[in-house]
Amino acid sequence: MDVILNFFSKEFDLPIVSLKLFDTFGVNDKRNKVLNYIKKKYIKNQLIDLTPGNQYLDLVNINDVCNLIFIVSNEILKKKIKGFKIFTANPKKPIKLKNLIKKLNNILDTKLKVKFGKRSYRKNEQFFYIKKNCNHPKWKIKNRIEKDLKQFFNI
């Protein structure tokens, strides 16, 4: 996709930005993602079947992503971005799923009922931290994961 975007940027002299998003989440997120699955089971006080939990998650609140889009949009409007650019929304703080569960158990009123190893890993799981990223220089994560998780779980 980036090859096509780069072509159009050069061919028509357009500022085009490709944003690479990681594990996004937010209060009204209804997608079939691991945090929503955990939340649904937590609310129902049910057993949560998970993988062994060694994969990494790069959790980014959707509000931080919106802030990045705002920054990039402003720079395009002010003609500060020329050509084709790639930016990531990488929090640079990956967390293993099993450590996320520990963090949630410290935050939540009731401990999660988790069975690790009950599910298989998916093909595209991330088992090592990808250091290569190109976050926009003016973009920083404003939200704190503990605060965001409390909001996400409505506590």
Regions found by a protein language model. Name each.
Residues 1-8, 38, 100-104:
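Hydrophobic alpha-helix immediately C-terminal to the catalytic Tyr-X-X-X-Lys motif of short-chain
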Residues 17-34:
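Flexible, glycine-rich beta-alpha linker
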Residues 42-155:
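C-terminal substrate-binding subdomain of Rossmann-fold SDR/epimerase-dehydratase oxidoreductases
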Residues 1, 31, 97:
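Conserved donor sugar-nucleotide recognition element shared by glycan-biosynthetic enzymes
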